[in-house]
């Protein structure tokens, strides 16, 4: 009560921020006549003047008022678009490193130009991040004219650019590109072998468009660069053939071989399922007749079974993926776009390929990985724009330290958001949607229908075709035409069906796109085209504007709001309504019981709908539950990735320092001394008697590891007073002398090149193996909870031990190679480098997260061998240890049954 009163008197924090910004807007408006009086040349020279002032000690904020006035005037002259006052406020919020929430149609693309120009002045580069290549190209081309007029260069980063094109784009003052391309370029740069192979500069300032889509929706899915491992495609086909013999358990605890947990998106084998699958695998010769699936040696077979079960039970064709040209292509659940080249991890993609009977491609090994949370936190300053961020304001603040500021619209919103209509079945719901569409078409009202999957969009399209209603379909299968379809979706009576609208980036203008009409028309007919467009625009406005129909609720309220936000732009009239049924996934999983009881009480008949605040509240509560769960997943992923992130920073820093250095001989010397010190300590324990020394073992390990034969025993026999410190010093001196002789024989320059090449290759190989080990550790770490230990703390502890172990192994391997390998010329070193840097077929994954363990998935399961050898056919797995029954006590000592403890790892 008191809080409301205070807010009423002094305003909310958002109100106070906007109020402060309006004072700056006033100053910019006062400058407008002065700036408008400048010639084009004088206006363009302002950039040089601003840069000079920065070098003389002024700050970006000191220049803000004048710089914004200059950009506004340049935009008026070049683009014929003048920034509104609220757009200036939005850009100020971006410059502060905050998120500006601006409704659809408020001109976010133009807002970005102000903050991008101002932050590009220091010459460190400014990145504008969009959600797809089309928008990156469009915005770079469109706004590049404005930046060029002011003397700034513009680049664009999209897929299929070569290294030199990327380097040129990143060298520009302002670079447009997609979040995935920026992230993958960062990872690729940290896999480069020389500094001149890198393309990015140090991250300085980024403006993220559709920030909620990129930093929240896609934050559950890490970016992974991976390469192929052993070919096991035959196993996927064999296991896939077993799945149709299993029956699904209709309700938990009932008969059936597997249970599907739709909330967690997981599939579990039941008791009878284990027995059935074991019997089938014995018949197929995949395991021996006396083998159990839970024998330690067979546990990795569960990887293939789980992947095949998920592929059949959880992943549907035309919903989660499409099949095109013999390939399984993932469909992005947030945007409805097809994503060629992307692959699921954990063997899931291979299982889906086997299910669809298309060629199965190899599994992958992680070469480099980062989450969007950790990538975007590398920037000195980060800002974002979106139409819907307020529902996730707490998460933005908690994870990224970003505050959300709601920018008032230029014109008041007059859209009519009607209540949800709930039907008993999907059939009744679609019938009602078709009636609503027909009514709108008859009255000349444009309609946009949002669906959550390609399957539903095609189902609705089929119903409309039967009803004789002309319409356009916009989904992942037709995205080449999507910009054109959306541009014309505002014509009177136009019907457009679209999968999830997040990130489409093209405004729906009532009457259709005038720019597109003019682009395709004869210039002599321009006036007639404008008159026809005005007529269509007025007709669409008179009919009530764009009507948005939601065919079901998304699991996030924010994405529902994005769909609604397509209507009512810049004060236009509009309306929206969601049609739901008890068969919709969200209703079925989270809200059906309460709503079904309510419907029974009201005695609803077929074809009738219910519209009630209780229903809307029940649905919103269901969405909040899902949002909270997804937030937990993202938070958990970040906590686990932070451990890897600290290690990633160390390794990437080491690589950069290595590439920068011309001479690493001092580093090699320090490593050699460290390795010899460790060998010595293992065989000559500190403060021990000479009788306890393993001199023979020490001589052997030094000869084996660094190729140096030393008469240590003879030294001790000849010099009885030789104590351990002096002995270690002598060993190090001998090793240094032998290495110096080798350098002299080969040549200093050749040896320096050789040392650097070896160090980089060993570091990279060790890091790849370490990433795989971290993946495997993360997969099973949740089992520590059974032993009353905190999995996160255990993960941190073990990951640290693994990392220090990796660094020690790197040192030992480097010393061994540079000491033992014989090189004779620079050509030999270069040949060795080329062999180590064979171009590998890389895959760029935006992998889905495992909902069960709330972690980043591994790129591949642990394999027993490397390479590309194809097995000769079915071969039984041979048990090496004692058989553990599923109901026997677990060998770990927890007291639980094996199936309930470490047996669950499978």
From Swiss-Prot:
GO biological process terms, alphabetically, are: intracellular protein transmembrane transport; protein import; protein targeting; protein transport by the Sec complex
Alphabetically ordered keywords of this record: ATP-binding, Cell inner membrane, Cell membrane, Cytoplasm, Membrane, Metal-binding, Nucleotide-binding, Protein transport, Translocase, Translocation, Transport, Zinc
Q: Any keyword Amino-acid biosynthesis?
A: no
Q: Where does ATP bind?
A: 87, 105-109, 507
List, in alphabetical order, the Gene Ontology terms for molecular function in this entry.
ATP binding; metal ion binding; protein-exporting ATPase activity
Cofactor annotation: Zn(2+)
Where the protein is mainly located, per its record? Answer: membrane
InterPro entries listed in its UniProt record: Helicase_ATP-bd, Helicase_C-like, P-loop_NTPase, SEC_C_motif, SecA, SecA_CS, SecA_DEAD, SecA_motor_DEAD
Top-level class of the enzyme under EC nomenclature: translocase
Protein's cellular compartments: Cell inner membrane; Cytoplasm
User: Which intervals of the chain are annotated as region Disordered?
Assistant: 553-576, 854-906
> Gene3D superfamilies from the entry?
Helical scaffold and wing domains of SecA (1.10.3060.10), P-loop containing nucleotide triphosphate hydrolases (3.40.50.300), SecA, preprotein cross-linking domain (3.90.1440.10)
Chemical reaction(s) catalysed: ATP + H2O + cellular proteinSide 1 = ADP + phosphate + cellular proteinSide 2
Q: What is its EC number?
A: 7.4.2.8
Cite the record's note on assembly: Monomer and homodimer. Part of the essential Sec protein translocation apparatus which comprises SecA, SecYEG and auxiliary proteins SecDF-YajC and YidC.
What is the name attached to this protein's record? Protein translocase subunit SecA
Protein source organism: Methylococcus capsulatus (strain ATCC 33009 / NCIMB 11132 / Bath)
């Amino acid at each position: 009560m008191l809080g409301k009163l205070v807010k009423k008197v002094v305003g909310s924090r958002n109100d106070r921020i906007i109020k402060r910004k309006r004072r700056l807007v006033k100053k910019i408006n006062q400058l407008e006549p002065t700036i408008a009086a400048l010639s084009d040349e004088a206006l363009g020279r302002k950039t040089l003047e601003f840069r000079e002032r920065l070098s003389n000690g002024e700050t970006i904020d000191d220049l803000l008022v004048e710089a914004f006035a200059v950009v506004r005037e340049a935009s008026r002259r070049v683009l014929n678009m003048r920034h509104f006052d609220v757009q200036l406020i939005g850009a100020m919020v971006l410059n502060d490193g905050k998120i500006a929430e601006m409704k659809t149609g408020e001109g976010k693309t133009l807002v970005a130009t102000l903050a991008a120009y101002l932050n590009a002045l220091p010459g460190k580069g400014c990145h504008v991040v969009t959600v797809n290549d089309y928008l990156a190209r469009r915005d770079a081309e469109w706004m590049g004219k404005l930046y060029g007029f002011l003397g700034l260069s513009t680049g664009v980063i999209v897929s299929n650019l070569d290294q030199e094109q990327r380097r040129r784009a990143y060298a520009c003052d302002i670079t447009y590109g997609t979040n995935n391309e920026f992230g993958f370029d960062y990872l690729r740069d940290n896999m480069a072998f020389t500094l001149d192979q890198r393309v990015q500069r140090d991250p300085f300032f980024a403006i993220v468009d559709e920030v909620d889509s990129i930093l929240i929706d896609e934050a559950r899915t890490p970016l992974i660069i991976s390469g192929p491992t052993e070919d096991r495609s035959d196993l996927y086909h064999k296991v896939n053939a077993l799945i149709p013999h299993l029956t699904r358990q209709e309700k938990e605890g009932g008969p059936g071989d597997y249970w599907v947990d739709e909330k967690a998106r997981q599939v579990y084998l039941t008791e009878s399922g284990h027995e059935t699958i074991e019997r089938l695998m014995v018949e197929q010769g995949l395991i021996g007749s006396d083998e159990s699936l839970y024998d330690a040696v067979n546990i990795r077979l569960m990887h293939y079974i789980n992947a095949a079960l998920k592929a059949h039970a959880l992943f549907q064709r035309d919903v989660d993926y499409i099949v095109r040209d013999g390939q399984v292509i993932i469909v992005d659940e947030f945007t409805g776009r097809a994503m060629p080249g992307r692959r699921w991890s954990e063997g899931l993609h291979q299982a889906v390929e086997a299910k669809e009977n298309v060629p199965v491609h190899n599994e992958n090994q992680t070469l480099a990985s980062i989450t969007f949370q950790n990538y975007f936190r590398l920037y000195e300053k980060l800002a974002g724009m979106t139409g819907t961020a307020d529902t996730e304001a707490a998460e933005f603040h908690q994870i990224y330290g970003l505050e959300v500021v709601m920018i008032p619209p230029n014109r008041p919103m007059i859209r009519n958001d009607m209540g949800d209509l709930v039907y008993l079945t999907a059939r009744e719901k679609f019938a009602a949607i078709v009636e609503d569409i027909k009514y709108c078409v008859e009255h000349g009202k444009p309609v946009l229908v949002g669906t959550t999957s390609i399957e539903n969009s095609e189902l609705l399209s089929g119903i409309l075709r039967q009803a004789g209603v002309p319409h356009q379909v916009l989904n992942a299968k037709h995205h080449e035409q999507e910009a054109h379809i959306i541009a014309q979706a505002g014509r009177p009576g136009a019907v457009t069906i679209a999968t999830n609208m997040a990130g489409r980036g093209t405004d729906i203008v009532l009457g259709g796109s005038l720019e597109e009409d003019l682009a395709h028309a004869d210039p002599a007919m321009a006036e007639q085209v404008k008159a026809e467009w005005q007529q269509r625009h007025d007709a669409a406005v008179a009919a009530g504007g764009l009507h948005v129909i939601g065919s079901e609720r998304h699991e996030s309220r924010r994405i529902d709001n994005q769909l609604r936000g397509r209507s009512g732009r810049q004060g236009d009239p509009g309306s929206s309504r969601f049609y739901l049924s008890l068969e919709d996934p969200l209703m079925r999983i989270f809200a059906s019981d309460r709503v079904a009881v309510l419907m029974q009480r009201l005695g609803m008949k077929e074809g009738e709908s219910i519209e009630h605040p209780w229903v809307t509240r029940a649905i919103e509560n269901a969405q909040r539950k899902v949002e909270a769960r997804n937030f937990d997943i993202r938070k958990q992923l970040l906590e686990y990735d932070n451990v890897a992130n600290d290690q990633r920073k160390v390794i990437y820093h080491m690589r950069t320092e290595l590439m920068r250095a011309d001479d690493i001989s001092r580093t090699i010397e320090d490593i050699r001394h460290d390795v010899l010190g460790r060998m010595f300590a293992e065989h000559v324990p500190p403060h021990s008697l000479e009788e306890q020394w393993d001199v023979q073992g020490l001589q052997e390990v030094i000869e084996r590891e660094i190729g140096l034969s030393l008469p240590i025993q003879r030294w001790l026999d000849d010099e009885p007073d030789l104590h351990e410190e002096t002995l270690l010093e002598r060993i190090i001196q001998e090793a240094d002398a032998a290495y110096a002789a080798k350098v002299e024989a080969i040549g200093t320059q050749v040896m320096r090149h050789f040392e650097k090449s070896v160090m980089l290759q060993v570091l990279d190989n060790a890091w790849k193996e370490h990433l795989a080990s971290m993946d495997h550790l993360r997969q099973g770490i949740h089992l520590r909870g059974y032993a009353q230990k905190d999995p996160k703390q255990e993960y941190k502890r073990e990951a640290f031990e693994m990392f220090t172990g990796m660094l020690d192994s790197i040192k030992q391997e480097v010393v061994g190679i540079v000491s033992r390998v014989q090189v004779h010329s620079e050509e030999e070193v270069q040949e060795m480098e080329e062999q180590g840097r064979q171009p590998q077929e890389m895959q760029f994954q935006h992998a889905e997260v495992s909902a069960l363990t709330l972690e980043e998935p591994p790129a591949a399961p642990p394999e027993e061998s490397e390479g590309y050898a194809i097995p000769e056919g079915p071969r039984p797995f041979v048990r090496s240890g004692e058989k553990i029954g599923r109901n026997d006590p677990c060998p770990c000592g927890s007291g639980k049954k094996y199936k309930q403890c470490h047996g669950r790892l499978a």
